[in-house]
């Protein structure tokens, strides 16, 4: 649903981002390969990383394939009808719940055309309903609940199904974007940076700003907003729970480290669902087009990369103990407090500047009419919320310790080995520390992501506000980390 207004805003100048077409190609076709590498190299067959990778001089492709569990029928084994059907069913369930469960409608920010789009928000209800079904199944059947065993048995094939889906969605919205006409009554718009004329880049970055489709029996769905918070974020929690169940099947217990990561990540996800209206003011919704970048990120990258730590712990359990657990919870509490307080302050100021909670905040009145906060959280750093977000990433990775393990055959009787129920033994051995390249990848990646997003936002705001933004930067000097950066 769209609301019209007579006001219109001219399109800002916009150049290439992500190093233009070469960067778009690399991200679109190499990142999916990286996800497969992570999930093959760190496995429950031979180790994390696969032992052959620690001895490159004697490395052979045939031996590596055996160690990582490469399908016997090659690339064809990466796909299965069962995993594809399960993925389709999961997406269909999410769409049905989006339509049938109660929701409240919220207007988005003003578009360049002067209109506003309406959004149907009920992610918290639909996701809670799904989790309730999974909880009931787990209560009845424990770690052998078929959903958990299906995920662990078909994980690579599920990854393939979701990857294909992300490519399909990106291609569909790109082709459909050519039907956008100026002044259309649906308030369809092209993204400012998404129609450069380079097909690959526009497909990657997203040509249409807010693509919407009408699905039979479901109704209108805003693809970008729906995918941002639903299948991928929900999948993140589901995968974590699946790996906790796998750890229980392997050892007969679930460690505090697995529980800690699963719970703190669930809190992060539930917070985004609880504050779903706030997403409508983010760069993803207001500025970026919807293309391969967001489709792959939402559908594949988030659930399959963000759950790497619990997948690791399913094979190599780590006990934090009371002190370690307290440190992890303190970090997540600090990060969450900064992240949510800063975002709430900004959102409250934008939606109701007369609210007593934010009415005392100082700001710069720009020539464009917008107000730039220079006190409160946003007077400390231009993106202080990113600092909180990054701090929250530490407890996701730290519980894995000096990661790395090797899996030995049953009866090896290795000293200090963890013994699985099937008799196989897990030791760190020469792999100790090397697994950190995988389990700590998230901290490094997330730092790069946040720095890049801040730079993009800074460039966008400088183009938009000009001298006012330069004045703002002199007052609020630091970008993300006060006193450092």
UniProtKB/Swiss-Prot annotation:
Annotated transmembrane regions: 18-38, 77-97, 131-151, 155-175, 319-339, 431-451
PROSITE patterns: STEROL_REDUCT_1, STEROL_REDUCT_2
Signal peptide: none
Topological category with respect to the lipid bilayer: Multi-pass membrane protein
Gene Ontology CC annotation, any one: endoplasmic reticulum membrane
Protein name: Delta(14)-sterol reductase
Main location per the UniProt record: membrane
